[in-house]
Amino acid sequence: MAMLQTNLGFITSPTFLCPKLKVKLNSYLWFSYRSQVQKLDFSKRVNRSYKRDALLLSIKCSSSTGFDNSNVVVKEKSVSVILLAGGQGKRMKMSMPKQYIPLLGQPIALYSFFTFSRMPEVKEIVVVCDPFFRDIFEEYEESIDVDLRFAIPGKERQDSVYSGLQEIDVNSELVCIHDSARPLVNTEDVEKVLKDGSAVGAAVLGVPAKATIKEVNSDSLVVKTLDRKTLWEMQTPQVIKPELLKKGFELVKSEGLEVTDDVSIVEYLKHPVYVSQGSYTNIKVTTPDDLLLAERILSEDS
């Protein structure tokens, strides 16, 4: 296993070809690091007839399970996925946004992209990203069975979600919002939150808090210890009926409210939000340590 130090940090891969620093991945995929490692570009020399095989081989952890219509949990082709891929990833301390950093040879954002693309419930994926990185997703447009659209990211998360919401199909029955920096979400959990979102109107994946959490004041003094049994850590996807999300955005915009996640928009409407229990492996990759943990989880799964 070779190791290369670049602006992205240390990257491991079976093969490196100099001087263009092309990294050979799996059997078919190649990454090119160009323009001082500012953009990740797929080589056009990849034979398109192999892309489906490469896709299936590269995402075993999250979407290798086959699907048939009997497993559809909501109406087929009724879900619009908004994949948030416009963050800067400053905590990763790398020159490239975290969602495009290779994770075992594949950009982080592509893991969940492929997972959603193989679900029969999904009609389309709206990728909210800088146009500079669109070709990473466009390379697979002919190999997936969903529509692919794009939206421009906003200044804050809620602005990016709103931008993506403007691009969804008007006939979609559910909006499924996901952070592309969570590559390890599995199909079973997605199906669970889709079903709950359809039933309640809004649902979010979450896991019970494992750590002791204390409320602390501005002087760094403990105010009280919170009851861990009532605390859950929120994840994504977060699933909301589009008419409910649009109504929530109207309220947020009219009152100048700021929210840190999507179901918070619905909470302002006093509408119930269901928490679907997810998996602790559905981590958000925001630091180098997270990247190492994700690699370990993927390696163990394979």
UniProtKB/Swiss-Prot annotation:
One GO term of the biological process aspect: isopentenyl diphosphate biosynthetic process, methylerythritol 4-phosphate pathway
Pathway given in the UniProt record: Isoprenoid biosynthesis; isopentenyl diphosphate biosynthesis via DXP pathway; isopentenyl diphosphate from 1-deoxy-D-xylulose 5-phosphate: step 2/6
Disruption phenotype: Albino phenotype and seedling lethal when homozygous. The phenotype is caused by an early arrest in chloroplast differentiation.
Transit peptide, from-to: 1-61
Site feature (Positions MEP for the nucleophilic attack) residues: 228, 284
Pfam family, one: IspD
Modified residues (N-acetylserine): 62
SUPFAM superfamilies in UniProt: Nucleotide-diphospho-sugar transferases (SSF53448)
InterPro entries, per database record: IspD, IspD/TarI, IspD/TarI_cytidylyltransf_bact, ISPD_synthase_CS, Nucleotide-diphossugar_trans
Nucleotidyltransferase listed as a keyword: yes
One MF annotation (Gene Ontology) recorded for this entry: 2-C-methyl-D-erythritol 4-phosphate cytidylyltransferase activity
Highest taxon above the source species: Eukaryota
Cofactor annotation remark: Divalent metal cations. Mg(2+), Ni(2+) and Mn(2+) are the most effective. Co(2+) and Ca(2+) are only minimally effective.
Induction description: Circadian-regulated with a peak in the late period of the light phase.
PANTHER family with a match to the protein in the record: 2-C-METHYL-D-ERYTHRITOL 4-PHOSPHATE CYTIDYLYLTRANSFERASE, CHLOROPLASTIC
Alphabetical list of NCBIfam families matching this protein: ispD (TIGR00453)
Function per UniProt: Enzyme of the plastid non-mevalonate pathway for isoprenoid biosynthesis that catalyzes the formation of 4-diphosphocytidyl-2-C-methyl-D-erythritol from CTP and 2-C-methyl-D-erythritol 4-phosphate (MEP). Is essential for chloroplast development and required for pigments and gibberellins biosynthesis.
Name of the protein in its database record: 2-C-methyl-D-erythritol 4-phosphate cytidylyltransferase, chloroplastic
The species this protein was found in: Arabidopsis thaliana
